[in-house]
């Protein structure tokens, strides 16, 4: 998942989306 889609991808997962080296991470 790319950075631009990260917030939507992580939404509803109680996550704080971060982006490292172009990679989306949903950090709980």
From Swiss-Prot:
Family of the protein in this entry: Belongs to the short scorpion toxin superfamily. Potassium channel inhibitor family. Alpha-KTx 09 subfamily.
Gene Ontology BP annotations: envenomation resulting in modulation of calcium channel activity in another organism
Domains: entry comment: Has the structural arrangement of an alpha-helix connected to a beta-sheet by disulfide bonds (CSalpha/beta).
Functional note: Calcium channel activator. Rapidly and reversibly activates ryanodine receptor 1 (RYR1).
Membrane spanning stretches: none
Protein name stated in the entry: Potassium channel toxin alpha-KTx 9.6
Lineage, opening ranks: Eukaryota, Metazoa, Ecdysozoa, Arthropoda, Chelicerata
Keywords associated with the record: Calcium channel impairing toxin, Disulfide bond, Ion channel impairing toxin, Neurotoxin, Ryanodine-sensitive calcium-release channel impairing toxin, Secreted, Toxin
Disulfide bond positions: 3-19, 6-24, 10-26
One GO molecular-function entry: toxin activity
Compartments, record wording: Secreted
CC per GO annotation: extracellular region
Keyword Manganese among record annotations: no
Tissue-wise expression: Expressed by the venom gland.
Broad class of where this protein is predominantly found: secreted
Range of residues in the leader sequence: none
InterPro entries: Scorpion_toxin-like_sf, Toxin_alpha-KTx_8/9
């Amino acid at each position: 998942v790319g950075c631009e889609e990260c917030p939507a991808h992580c939404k509803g997962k109680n996550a704080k989306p971060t982006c490292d080296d172009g990679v989306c991470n949903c950090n709980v």
